[in-house]
Amino acid sequence: AIEKLSAAGYQYIGMDHFALPGDDLATAQEQGHLHRNFMGYTTHADCDLIGLGVSSISHIGDTYSQNPRDLPSWEIAIDNGRLPTWRGMSLDADDVLRADLIQQLMCHGDVYFAALEQRHDIEFEDYFRDDLARLKPLEADGLVERSLRGLKVTSRGRLLLRIIAACFDRYLQQPQSEPARFSKAI
């Protein structure tokens, strides 16, 4: 698919997104302003999103909420004049840091340690010791390169961005005995 769309003049943005050169997504990628949220790639960084329908997700500031997954529960809340929020969570400092890191990987294909260290007041190698250990097999497979300055996703790795990013998602690393959760970092 990538080869055919590229041959037709489309630019590969990431995962399942393509755009024509000059399109807002292509321009944002070229200028380093591309952003990703739970709906996909976008040019709108850090804007609040309000979900209205069944199972929809809202993102306001450092909080996420989700409406009920079933229509009857959603309708009952609406009929009673209530917001149909089923569950929600607030991001802590670790969530914000990991979201920043994963955003850099998914949108730009690289992470510069010094930039994250400065923005979040951490020592990258110490903070992400376990995560970097999980990344080692992907380095060995040629999907990501690690240097003293940072991480760079290879052209092969771009096809497996979710797997690379998952190394840094603490919610995906929870023991299997705990209930599965959607990633708060992506």
Regions found by a protein language model. Give the residues of each.
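Intrinsically disordered or highly flexible coil/loop and linker segments, enriched in small
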Residues: 84, 110-111, 144, 173-177
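Short, amphipathic alpha-helical interaction segments positioned at domain boundaries
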Residues: 156-186
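A short, conserved structural fragment
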Residues: 139-149
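Minor-groove-contacting beta-hairpin "wing" of winged helix-turn-helix DNA-binding domains
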Residues: 150-154
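Short amphipathic alpha-helical interaction segments
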Residues: 124-139
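Short secondary-structure transition/capping segments
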Residues: 24-28, 137, 159
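C-terminal scaffold of the Radical SAM
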Residues: 1-125, 185-186
